[in-house]
């Protein structure tokens, strides 16, 4: 059974399709974010499906791999180092690959050969306080490192490009899921570049959600808050938990990743350009699931519904018309 999202009871919304500039006097729509109840037993069988996961040897990637594998999928784990002994599922193959290398990523996809589901999960944290002054041996301001940019943004874009290319050529559709971050919506002041990049990954999902469905390809994101992985080991997570703050397990986030790849939706997040049918049942697409402690929340639909409020009614109407004029489909 493919999990199908059921909307919570919310006040009636005024959708963009009915907006006109003279509606500025109308009461703005109200909406609450949609809570999700995701259970592993709701994941359908995935026998015969091939899943590729970057950063798949540990943390969220490995947790998702084990869930996919229990559903019957064949898994390819792309990473710089193999999983610890005994942690990878039996029906998985490790492929050594640096996500910042186009050549290595191409070779990894070629070795997998076929792709039904692609999870762009590899990521690193900021290696330095980016906007503090550091100096070289001559006392000159030192150029900062760009690993967080290369891995988290460039690598994710390259991985996604290759995945979409394979899915288009195969002609059988597919699903792309990107591991973003809660910091993409609520930035951390001590992680400014990391937060900006994760916001950019959410932007990538928004930019592609209207075009990829032409090929029966969906794209979604998961936005983990504090999660116990190598980026947030237990000795750091412990004080958060002791203070009563929510911390997620890698398994919980991994389950959101798998759900995002297989679920269906009763309506689109929003229409774009020439589109005029919002209530269209289809694959889960263009959405982000926030994972916070043991709670799942879908963010994008309500943000889209409230666009006239935060973007402006007139701005929304005119932008919609501009998009329709430039819509190449």
UniProtKB/Swiss-Prot annotation:
Report which superkingdom the organism of origin falls in.
Eukaryota
Say yes or no: keyword Transmembrane helix present. yes
**According to Swiss-Prot or TrEMBL, what is its membrane topology?**
Single-pass membrane protein
The protein's name in its UniProt record: Short-chain dehydrogenase/reductase prx4
Question: Which cystines does this chain contain?
Answer: none
**Source organism of this protein record:** Penicillium roqueforti (strain FM164)
Q: Which GO terms describe its molecular function?
A: oxidoreductase activity
Q: Where in the cell is it found?
A: Membrane
**What function is annotated for this protein?**
Short-chain dehydrogenase/reductase; part of the gene cluster that mediates the biosynthesis of PR-toxin, a bicyclic sesquiterpene belonging to the eremophilane class and acting as a mycotoxin. The first step of the pathway is catalyzed by the aristolochene synthase which performs the cyclization of trans,trans-farnesyl diphosphate (FPP) to the bicyclic sesquiterpene aristolochene. Following the formation of aristolochene, the non-oxygenated aristolochene is converted to the trioxygenated intermediate eremofortin B, via 7-epi-neopetasone.
Keywords of this protein's UniProt record, alphabetized?
Glycoprotein, Membrane, NADP, Oxidoreductase, Transmembrane, Transmembrane helix
Where does this protein chiefly localize?
Answer: membrane
UniProt EC number = 1.1.99.-
Where are the glycosylation sites? Answer: 91
Q: Where does NADP(+) bind?
A: 58, 60, 81, 98, 121, 161, 194, 198, 229
Active site positions: 194, 198
Metabolic or biological pathway, per its Swiss-Prot or TrEMBL entry? Sesquiterpene biosynthesis
Question: What is the enzyme's class at the highest EC level?
Answer: oxidoreductase
Give the CC-aspect GO terms.
membrane
């Amino acid at each position: 059974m493919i999990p199908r999202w059921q909307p919570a009871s919310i006040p009636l919304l005024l959708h963009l399709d009915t907006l006109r500039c003279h509606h500025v006097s109308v009461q703005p729509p109200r909406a609450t974010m949609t809570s999700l109840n995701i259970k592993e037993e709701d994941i359908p069988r995935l026998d015969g499906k091939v899943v590729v996961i970057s950063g798949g040897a540990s943390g969220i990637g490995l947790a998702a791999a084990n869930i996919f594998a229990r559903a019957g999928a064949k898994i390819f784990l792309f990473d710089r180092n193999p999983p610890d002994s005994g942690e990878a599922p039996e029906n998985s193959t490790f492929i050594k690959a640096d996500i910042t290398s186009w050549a290595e990523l191409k070779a990894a996809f070629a070795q997998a050969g076929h792709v039904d589901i692609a999870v762009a999960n590899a990521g690193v944290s900021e290696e330095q306080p980016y906007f503090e002054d550091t100096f070289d041996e001559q006392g000159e301001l030192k150029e900062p490192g760009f690993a967080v940019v290369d891995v988290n943004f460039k690598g994710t874009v390259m991985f996604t490009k290759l995945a979409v290319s394979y899915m288009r050529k195969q002609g059988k559709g597919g699903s792309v899921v990107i591991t973003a971050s809660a910091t993409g919506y609520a930035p951390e002041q001590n992680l400014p570049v990391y937060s900006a990049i994760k916001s950019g990954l959410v932007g990538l999902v928004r930019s592609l959600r209207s075009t990829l469905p032409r090929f029966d390809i969906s794209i979604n994101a998961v936005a983990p808050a504090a999660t116990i992985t190598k980026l947030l080991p237990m000795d750091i997570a412990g004080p958060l938990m002791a203070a009563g703050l929510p911390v997620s397990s890698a398994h919980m986030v991994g389950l959101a990743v798998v759900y995002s790849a297989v679920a269906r939706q009763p309506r689109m997040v929003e229409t774009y350009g020439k589109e005029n049918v919002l209530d269209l049942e289809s694959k889960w697409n263009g959405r982000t699931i926030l994972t916070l402690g043991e709670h799942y929340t879908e963010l994008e639909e309500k943000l889209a519904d409230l666009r006239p409020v935060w973007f402006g009614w007139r701005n929304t109407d005119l932008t919609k018309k501009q998009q329709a004029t430039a819509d190449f489909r």
